[in-house]
Amino acid sequence: TYEISGMKVGGMPGLAPTVMVGSMFYNGHTVVKNATKGLFNKIEAEKQLRKAEESSDMTGLPTMVDLIAENSQAAANYLDFMVDITELPLLLDIVSESAQIESLDYIYEQGMMDRIIFNSLNPHSKETIYKKLKEVQCNNAILLLHSTKYILSSNKDALLQEMIPKAQEAGISNILVDTVVIDIPTL
């Protein structure tokens, strides 16, 4: 079991409650007005966040927010807002490696790193991202087990065993895993 920003995560089933993760600021999210600039309706975003927190209180299941951003400028706007209004852990979810690096620098400079879970490292993540994670002392990351080499769930363990040492070398001590289940019949 890990503790991330005061929240217990993972461990043996039944010892800590399952954590709910809700996404915000994704492409098409109703609160986003301009995804490139990170402009959004703050009142509506806070309402949606409070609803998630209420659900967490009602169910006893802790909540995290997957903060999705198109670039580092948008990420900075979303992060500043979220850090001001909630104590919840935040998943940093940005596709572009350059934007990930810029955002990690911003998070480090603003003193937010203890609240952040990097989402995510995958088999194609470059060495530059691992170096940056170590440099900014990010302890929390998700390993995304998505690879054309390891499609079946039966061989995801081999991929995980390849990725764990790299993450640990980068200073990631709290490793979460996204196994990426693909429902082939629906494709």
Whereabouts are the PLM-identified features?
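Active-site beta->alpha loop and helix N-cap motifs at the rims of alpha/beta catalytic domains
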Residues: 2-155
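Catalytic alpha/beta core domains of metabolic enzymes, predominantly
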Residues: 133-187
